[in-house]
Amino acid sequence: MAQTSAERGLAVYEAHCSSCHSPDANGDGPAHRGVVGRRAGALKDFDYSPALRNSKILWTRATLKAWLTNPEALIPGQGMDYQLDDAGDREDVVAYLATLKRPRAR
């Protein structure tokens, strides 16, 4: 059975992103659960760069793909020095990130 884009994205995420990020815990980078639809720099418990915190970017599939293509071009002065060179990998990682929904409030 062929893998879905999100399944491929999980594999790419684990290989290229998980040394700094995870779905639920901050590391060198912020946690990703609920990132699609969230404002950049919005997690209160993560120390973002001033450029990212003040960017007013909304993380959509399109802005996340632009970010993964070249973070510095999207938000000059941000702190992430990594990008995904393969467009398919970017598409798949964004598909995976979109599966990481925020838990519903009780």
PLM features: what roles do these ranges have?
Residues 6, 10, 25, 57, ...:
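Solvent-exposed, acidic/flexible segments
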Residues 6-7, 30-50:
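Short glycine/threonine-rich turn/loop motifs
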Residues 18, 22-23, 33, 46, ...:
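Mobile acidic interaction elements
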Residues 45-65:
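Short Fe-S-cluster ligation motifs
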Residues 60-106:
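C-terminal capping alpha-helices of c-type cytochrome domains
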